[in-house]
């Protein structure tokens, strides 16, 4: 099976033909508009989709193709730092406070978490901090076989800060602890922060390139998985992000959680 994660940089309705050329089973798209508030043609393309967002123009969408079925997973919870009396956004939070996450199942078989981490104003837990907070609540749900976490994390270990427990490197280790590893880094042998292939080009400038989009797969899928990153010569015409194409050899899969 083939899965694509891509930050489309808005106006997905104008870019579906380019996506269709990748021939994926499911598309997980960041920064896309809500099909329910868009054109008839885009709604037809979207099919039985899932979507969450902060405005009708920018959200996180899941679009199944080829007869595949996705179902929203009801992941709700809260976390409070132990031993803390006063409660604020740094010491306690709920799933609804965090942006943007979309957990779902595919064909009652694979479990996915689509991610587009966001900046939350002056919150020190912006971007990768949002995912770190999410893990404190939902680590248990993610510790399953046939699990895939993927999306635009807006993060890399090159931006790790001192005295901060929610750095990119810390999150990578927390994911490793629950048997989720980056497919790209597994297949290339490269360390986080030393990537030779980039996924994001600031202002679509080839000289301002970063690796901030990821696919993490559970340990049982690692040997069956490979990831390809789109060519900027093609994809910079559509977005500042490159699509990541995840291919899973399902012939080795035993169905069901």
Task: Describe the residue ranges of each PLM region.
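Short catalytic/ligand-binding loop motif for oxyanion handling, primarily in non-cytosolic enzymes
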Residues: 12-14, 35-38, 59, 71, ...
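Structured beta-strand-rich core segments of catalytic domains in phosphoester-bond hydrolases
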Residues: 33-111, 115-117
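Short proline/glycine-enriched turn/loop segments at secondary-structure junctions
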Residues: 51, 202-205, 233-237
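Conserved beta strand-loop-helix elements of the APE1-like EEP
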Residues: 55-75, 202-224, 248-249
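Active-site-proximal loop/helix segment associated with metal-binding centers of metalloenzymes
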Residues: 110-126, 173-176
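Metal-dependent phosphoesterases centered on the DNase I-like endonuclease/exonuclease/phosphatase
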Residues: 129-212, 217
């Amino acid at each position: 099976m083939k899965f694509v994660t891509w930050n489309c940089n808005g106006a997905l309705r104008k870019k579906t033909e380019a996506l269709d050329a990748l021939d994926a089973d499911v598309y997980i798209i960041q920064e896309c508009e809500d099909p329910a508030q868009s054109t008839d043609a885009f709604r037809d393309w979207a099919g039985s989709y899932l979507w969450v967002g902060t405005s009708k123009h920018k959200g996180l969408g899941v679009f199944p193709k080829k007869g595949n079925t996705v179902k929203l997973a009801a992941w709700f919870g809260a976390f409070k730092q132990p031993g803390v009396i006063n409660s604020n956004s740094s010491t306690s939070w709920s799933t609804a406070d965090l942006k943007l996450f979309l957990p779902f199942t595919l064909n009652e078989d694979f479990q996915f978490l689509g991610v587009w981490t966001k900046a939350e104003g002056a919150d020190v837990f912006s971007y990768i901090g949002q995912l770190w907070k999410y893990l404190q609540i939902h680590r248990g749900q993610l510790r399953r076989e046939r699990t895939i976490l993927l999306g635009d994390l807006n993060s890399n270990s090159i931006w790790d800060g001192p005295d901060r427990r929610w750095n990119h490197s810390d999150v990578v280790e927390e994911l490793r602890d629950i048997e989720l590893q980056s497919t790209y880094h597994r297949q290339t042998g490269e360390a986080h922060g030393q990537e030779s292939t980039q996924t994001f080009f600031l202002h679509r400038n080839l000289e301002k390139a970063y690796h901030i989009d990821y696919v993490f797969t559970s340990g049982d899928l690692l040997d069956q998985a490979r990831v390809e990153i789109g060519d900027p010569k093609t994809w910079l015409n559509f977005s500042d992000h490159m699509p990541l194409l995840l291919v899973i050899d399902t012939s080795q899969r035993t169905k069901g959680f």
